């Protein structure tokens, strides 16, 4: 079935909120929100311009009758260990096959703790 071969793309940019400075070399992870366990959809690092792109397929999120992911992102430091920012409070319910984000992170969240 053609729908089963459909690819989903989440892309966007990450910048410092106060200055608009692109934030490169951060880890971006995409998730599908579910009732029990959230599905990991993929991850990548931002480039020097703060841009990222993650591709995934319906098999990565499909449970029961789910036809579209309930999408959120988590942004980590370059090592992928410290959570800096997440969009879980603004989940994109039934996300489209092509979602674009502009993520603005406060400078205070970027400072090592």
Give the ranges of each region predicted by the language model.
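Beta-strand-dominated extracellular/periplasmic modules and repeats
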Residues: 2-112
